[in-house]
Amino acid sequence: MLCMFAVLLLSVFSVVAPVHGLVVEQFRAPACERCAGHRGVTIATSTDDVVCAAVAGEIVFVGQVAGVAYVVERISADVRITYGQIQPLDSLTVGQQVDEGQPLGLAQSRVYIGVRVGTRPVHPLRYLGLAGARLVSSSRLLGVTRTRSR
């Protein structure tokens, strides 16, 4: 029910690809809260590419965790987007409202994008509507290139 509400909520928002690049590590849901997995996607980018907010929201964290820089944006009461491995803009502050497409920082050679609904990680590209079957390649239109399944 919560996930359905969040999908409905996102359907009224406009979404942009946060960064251009190739998905080099796919989402792998963990079997349990502390189990191994990859709770987002990793996108290979060009260093210093601009990383933008996928959806309008509020910045709730800007800082480092274990030496890696992160920006976390709350887009609804229970949904957060995490942008990792970026150099946040100096002007970005906790509590700041950001618009969809607004620059958050600069990419390193890779950028991590994760989405959580409550405490549960969900596939960020599918959740944000940036992946899925299309008659026209959305990856070129949206700036995200997916790797082929093997």
For the regions a language model picked out, list residue spans one by one.
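Surface-exposed, glycine-biased beta-strand/turn segments
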Residues: 3-70, 99-100, 122-126, 130-150
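Short hydrophobic beta/alpha edge segments that flank linear recognition/processing sites
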Residues: 43, 70-73, 98-113
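Short, solvent-exposed loop/turn positions at domain surfaces
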Residues: 45-47, 86, 92
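Short acidic/polar mixed-charge low-complexity motifs
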Residues: 49, 77-80, 120
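Zn2+-dependent peptidoglycan hydrolase active-site motif and core
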Residues: 54-88, 110-112
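Acidic, glycine-anchored pre-beta loop/turn
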Residues: 62, 89-98, 102, 119
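Short, compositionally biased
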Residues: 75, 111-126
